[in-house]
Structure formats: structure tokens, C-alpha cells
Amino acid sequence: MSTNTQQSKSCPIPTRVLHLKDWSQLPDCYSQTPGGTLFSTTPGGTRIIYDRKFLLDCRNSPIARTPPCCLPQIPGVTIPSLHPVSKLQELKEELEEEKELAADDSQFEMDI
């Protein structure tokens, strides 16, 4: 064990009071403040505060604009679709024709 332990001094978290004039000014989400700051807690109880400016900076960062490396190969979502739009349209038309043919048959036909 180390006998040279140093205690760090804590500093207060800067806060401001915002007085609302109307109930409609309250945020929709419980983890959001009227000023736009988001906050959260970890399972251990640590408070995480995300300032609006920080979140906007993260959104505009180059890392946020690149896709994750381990995405699944989903045609039309993560990779270009394998079938052109015209082929998909042809398949839809064929399905509609089959439904129309099935609807023309009478359900209660009898041979006399």
C-alpha cells in the first residue's frame, strides 16, 4: 500500500437558476434542462452532464461523420441494394397480379 496519499480538493459545479414563465417552457425529456443541457447517471451513481455546446461539437466532428467499422451487410441499408428499383417494381406487380387472380375465384363454387 502506498502511504503517500494526496487528497484532491473538490470544487463546486457551476449552476444557474432559470425562472420559467410558462409550463410550456419545460423540456419534454426528464433528463434535459430548460437550457438544453442533458444529464445522466451511471449505475455507480456518477453524474454525467452534457452541455449543449459539447454535444453540437461532437455532432460536427469528423469521427461522427464516419460509419462504425463493424456494421452488418444489409442490402439497401449499409450497402447499395442488389436489385435495382425496376426489378423490385416488377416483383410487386407480379404479386398484385397473383392476388387479383386469386380474388376472381369464387369461394363457394360447386359442380352440379
From Swiss-Prot:
Signal peptide: none
Modification Phosphothreonine occurs at: T42, T46
Entry GO terms, CC: cytoplasm
Gene Ontology terms: biological process: negative regulation of translational initiation; regulation of muscle hypertrophy
Pfam family, one: eIF_4EBP
Keywords: Phosphoprotein, Protein synthesis inhibitor, Translation regulation
Molecular function terms from GO: eukaryotic initiation factor 4E binding
Modification type Phosphotyrosine: residues: Y30
Family, as annotated: Belongs to the eIF4E-binding protein family.
Subunit structure: Interacts with eif4e1a.
Function summary: Regulates eif4e1a activity by preventing its assembly into the eIF4F complex.
Protein name per UniProt: Eukaryotic translation initiation factor 4E-binding protein 3-like
Protein source organism: Danio rerio
